[in-house]
Amino acid sequence: RAPENTADDTSHPNTAYGESKLQAEQYLRTVPDLHYVILRPTGVYGPRERDYFIMARSISRHIDFAVGYTPQEITFVYVRDLVQAIMKSLTAPGVERHAFFISDGQTYNSRAFSDLLRAELGNPWLLRICAPLWFLRAVCAVNGTICRLLGKTTTLNTDKYHILAQRNWRCDITPAIRLLGYTPQYSLQQGVQETVAWYKAHHWL
């Protein structure tokens, strides 16, 4: 099992998005006497979130798509737990100028989320497709280039490849529990249940 990432580890972002976040953190640290708290949530899901909705819609259409053959270790946080962490960071004493990872405290394999989605959607039959990373990389590169030439934006680009190719998303939330008083309230199963119920109630599915 891969080691947990901690807030004290040296950051090595592999996407433009991650690099922009790191630069923002570095800038904040250069401002003297500025009171700030940095939260680093892992995979955020819940009502209105669209990236994981795409997975739910795909499963409702009988396709479960995954990439890479090496097992992933993934972490998630339900949006309500993230809000809890944000609110606690506003009032917790002595946490200024600190960074915290936020998750539900558990580590999951790459099928955990899709299996829970499938259960909440009534266990539809599935065609499971697992593409090799080289194929995903080629698709993301070609699609990103075409959209860039056409002046369009796309989420299927080299950044997305690096996100999906990452195998270790484990993180240490002990400091958030100890210093913020953060306590995850939602298991992945509970969060997925609420999320799918919201999708259905608002006719997303």
How should these model regions be labeled?
Residues A7-T10, A56-V67, N123, R148, ...:
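A short C-terminal helix-loop "cap" of Rossmann-like NAD(P)-dependent dehydrogenase/epimerase domains
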Residues R1-G43, D64-G68:
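Catalytic helix-loop patch of NAD(P)-dependent Rossmann-fold dehydrogenases
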Residues E19, Q23-A24, E49-I54, G68-L90, ...:
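Substrate-positioning beta->alpha
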Residues T15, I74-R80, Y108, C171, ...:
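Residue-level signal for the nucleotide or nucleotide-sugar donor/cofactor binding architecture
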Residues R48, H62-I63, P93, L121-P124, ...:
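A general structural signal marking secondary-structure boundaries and capping sites
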Residues C171-L179, T183, S187-L205:
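Amphipathic terminal alpha-helices
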Residues K88-T155, Q189, Q193-V196:
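Mid/C-terminal beta-alpha module of Rossmann-like enzyme folds, strongest
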Residues V79, D115, A141-G181:
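Conserved C-terminal active-site "lid" loop/helix of NAD(P)H-dependent oxidoreductases
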